């Protein structure tokens, strides 16, 4: 038997001590979703509070809480419908789907395969003789798949909507409101700590790949012709 990895050991301890566990366990579970237990919930809340204290309250930045579901036109304008995609491959034998770049990285140890482009990803699957990790079957040629949750807004299907995969759109959509609230002065920032959803092809990495999670994001707006920052002197001597 292969030795257990440190990640597997820590994950098991976290589940046993009530930090988190797989969601929907009594119905067989579903990959990509977790439920935070008592300790996990408290830890998560503490992290969020520290983030808000350091990045938001101390700087006098503004907070938002915007809807998770957005109309389709928002993501058409942002380019998400065209670009928020990943290469998916399917097993010809068992029908299981996988991220093509992830399979290549796991087999070869290569990094950032996604950035290599579709043709290189397709050729690597063949060159490396990569097969289905579940049953050993042959894999189909990968295709681009949109990894956003699609829904209908309105009980009778009035308008197409999507669950946001990140919170940045909310800050840009509400820039004018934030600018007015900031007394029409820059720089100012909008911050948000909220749920997002990503319809991952094959979330097989525990907490590292989830279909629903909380993201903490901040957008700083400034005048490009006068990009001075009143907080720069606080960190000007820091080495990166």
Predicted regions and their residues:
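TRNA-recognition modules of translation machinery and tRNA-sensing kinases, especially anticodon-binding
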Residues: 2-240
